[in-house]
């Protein structure tokens, strides 16, 4: 409870997985009936909630859809990965023993802290037994959970997300999802939704099979995506008299460019409406293959130069509040 100065009478509703420093989500929202949802990322886990089937390997895919032959691996692959993991456990990393985000192995100095070495090797053992063999059910990873009151997953197959929002008119739940090398997404969360990770990122014509125990969770293409990731973060609906021109439009923020985007919804509020011909496919595509530039975003761009935006929200006063981690500032946009 908020007493006007600080929070009191705190109550633990749910412990969320956060074994790693990245890809653990954390955004929360309450719907029009007061049900509270939270989103988690993959937390560097690979299992049924990341759409791995019994015949699959636990390999992280970067984009698109892979063939069965590309997915399958044998015991030699498993042992090779495990030995590689143990080898780098004796090197110093700022991330983790698998080396994500680190320089080449030979360029890293030896780890001098024995406790770090033990922790690194324990992670390798965990990967060996759980990731490679048990097809572990990494509970509450890559999902949208119903927190209060407790309920089943609203969605599975989410790589990572910094944004949840509820349409004030329809009550529909929306999220943002961060791609790897390709495709940041905006998704409408249908009941028992499968967002596709780690088999699919971005729109596709290829169907995927939901994992055992989650057959009722169905995949649908994103409502909008960026082929070149923008570091998509928060989203909120403009339920404010100050923004009459954009009343009930969806606003979305990013961290790579410091941009805020605006999206007009159709009559059913299940899709977006665009005037630009090149946005009719619901994708901001690359200008050309292997380019580092996206198509023009002029139609959907609302504001820019906000730094690394971690959150946006329309407040009770009708203003749009923008949290910029890079600037260390909360901006207020009003008319």
Q: Which residues make up each language-model segment?
A:
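Conserved strand-loop elements at the edges of beta-sheets that form or border functional pockets
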Residues: 156, 304, 314
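Hydrophobic beta-strand residues in large extracellular and virion-surface proteins
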Residues: 12, 28, 36, 260, ...
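Blade-level signature of beta-propeller repeat domains, shared across WD40, Kelch, NHL, RCC1
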Residues: 310-335
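Beta-propeller domain segments
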Residues: 25, 33-35, 41-299, 307, ...
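Flexible "stalk/tail and boundary" regions
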Residues: 5, 147-149, 332-335
């Amino acid at each position: 409870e908020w007493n006007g100065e600080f929070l009191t009478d705190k109550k633990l509703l749910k412990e969320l997985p956060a074994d790693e420093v990245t890809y653990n989500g954390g955004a929360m929202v309450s719907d029009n009936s007061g049900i509270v949802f939270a989103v988690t990322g993959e937390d560097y886990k690979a299992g049924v909630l990341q759409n791995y089937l019994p015949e699959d390997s636990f390999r992280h895919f970067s984009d698109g859809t892979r063939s069965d032959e590309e997915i399958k691996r044998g015991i030699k692959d498993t042992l090779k990965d495990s030995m590689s993991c143990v080898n780098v456990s004796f090197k110093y990393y700022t991330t983790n023993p698998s080396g994500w985000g680190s320089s080449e192995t030979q360029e890293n100095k030896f780890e001098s802290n024995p406790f770090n070495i033990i922790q690194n090797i324990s992670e390798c053992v965990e990967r060996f037994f759980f990731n490679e063999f048990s097809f572990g059910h990494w509970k509450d990873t890559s999902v949208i959970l119903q927190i209060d009151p407790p309920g089943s997953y609203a969605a599975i197959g989410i790589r990572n997300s910094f944004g949840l929002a509820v349409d004030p008119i329809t009550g529909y739940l929306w999220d943002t999802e961060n791609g790897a090398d390709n495709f940041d997404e905006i998704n409408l969360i249908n009941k028992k939704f499968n967002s596709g990770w780690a088999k699919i990122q971005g729109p596709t014509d290829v169907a995927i099979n939901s994992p055992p125990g989650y057959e009722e969770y169905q995949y649908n293409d994103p409502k909008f995506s960026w082929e070149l990731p923008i570091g998509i973060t928060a989203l909120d609906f403009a339920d404010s008299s100050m923004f009459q021109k954009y009343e009930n439009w969806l606003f979305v923020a990013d961290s790579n460019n410091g941009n805020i985007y605006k999206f007009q919804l159709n009559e059913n509020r299940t899709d977006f409406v665009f005037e630009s011909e090149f946005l009719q496919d619901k994708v901001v595509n690359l200008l050309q293959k292997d380019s580092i530039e996206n198509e023009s975003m002029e139609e959907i761009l609302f504001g820019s130069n906000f730094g690394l935006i971690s959150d946006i929200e329309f407040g009770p006063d009708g203003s749009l509040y923008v949290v910029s981690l890079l600037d260390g500032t909360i901006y207020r946009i009003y008319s």
